[in-house]
Amino acid sequence: MTEYVVLVNEQGDAIGTMEKLEAHEKGLLHLAFSVLLYRETDLGKEFLLQKRAECKYHSKNKWSNTCCSHPRVNENVEAAGTRRLNEEIGITGVLPEQFVNLGWFIYQAELENGLSEHEQDYILIANTPDVSFILNPEEVSDIQWWSEADIEKELKANPDTFSVWFPTVYKKVLTHLHQAN
């Protein structure tokens, strides 16, 4: 099945669609979302990170947020987040209305294989203490709960361990969670 992305302008208005790989080859601005699930523990917050599968066409074997993708045409980002949590890691218990939408940011990055990310990326978070998962090996090779301290340590020591968008997503999530407390 051919996948399409929604092309947007700098203000976030939809201006068309394009096949996903072509949009990444041309570096055109398109709609995306990043989901980051977290839980409260006695030692503080933990974040559920996925390691992208070896077979992904970019950012393979990189740690990233819980899931990320592109909404389909006429699909809101919260519904898309719920859909992709199920498709990538088998999580079915998070409903669209459980997400807190932190808004969007635009980033552009050249990737390791000549492709380019240029995304208007919505950040969705949810507090999910009890989730179980079944990994889709075409999407994810590992999934782990990470503490804030472990993420900070790894970001400082080995930033290339993570996808190019993850540090921005993580920083915006932390800012929101620290302001909310």
UniProtKB/Swiss-Prot annotation:
Annotated binding of Mn(2+), by residue: H24, H30, H70, E117, E119
Disulfide bonds: none
Any one Gene Ontology molecular-function term assigned to this protein's record: isopentenyl-diphosphate delta-isomerase activity
Pathway recorded for this protein: Isoprenoid biosynthesis; dimethylallyl diphosphate biosynthesis; dimethylallyl diphosphate from isopentenyl diphosphate: step 1/1
E.C. designation(s): 5.3.3.2
Residue ranges occupied by any Nudix hydrolase domain in the UniProt entry: 28-168
Cytoplasm found in the keyword field: yes
Positions of Mg(2+) binding: E88
SUPFAM superfamilies for the chain: Nudix
Subcellular location: Cytoplasm
Catalytic activity: isopentenyl diphosphate = dimethylallyl diphosphate
Top-level EC class: isomerase
HAMAP family: Idi
Family stated for the protein in its record: Belongs to the IPP isomerase type 1 family.
Record function comment: Catalyzes the 1,3-allylic rearrangement of the homoallylic substrate isopentenyl (IPP) to its highly electrophilic allylic isomer, dimethylallyl diphosphate (DMAPP).
Name of this protein: Isopentenyl-diphosphate Delta-isomerase
Annotated source species: Aliivibrio fischeri (strain MJ11) (Vibrio fischeri)
